[in-house]
């Protein structure tokens, strides 16, 4: 606006736009707890996730004449062979991980998340990172899974999503950190 330039944001990877969360005096939060409790939880609820489209059409690029192999992007060493045991990339894999977490670990999360011998975490980080599932989908799936909206397990997990938001918030407002 200051430079007479209109910018629009189409947020698909965060629960709240970093520019929409401000202190009462208009300043920027620097500490997580007030950011999350007074900023996020007092703000409008995260947008409800949209349904998946019935069909996605892609541009035909087969005529371009180059294959992915021609680009030399794949490694010579098969370093990723063990990933398939732990991570199924894509939306389906993300949905499976979320369902598994809700079924087996969400209730008990607050106590089990710090015990390495227990599968007490969601294991959703790579799926969130690569956009295979949105934090909105996770947020509302957890809200729907808990009968008691005051559950300490639910509050604890949602605050973990809040920490993810806070890191993006800080990078947005303080890009040199």
Predicted regions and their residues:
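Trp/Phe/Arg-rich N-terminal binding region typifying the photolyase-homology
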Residues: 1-47
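Glycine/tryptophan-enriched, flexible segments
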Residues: 26-28, 34-177
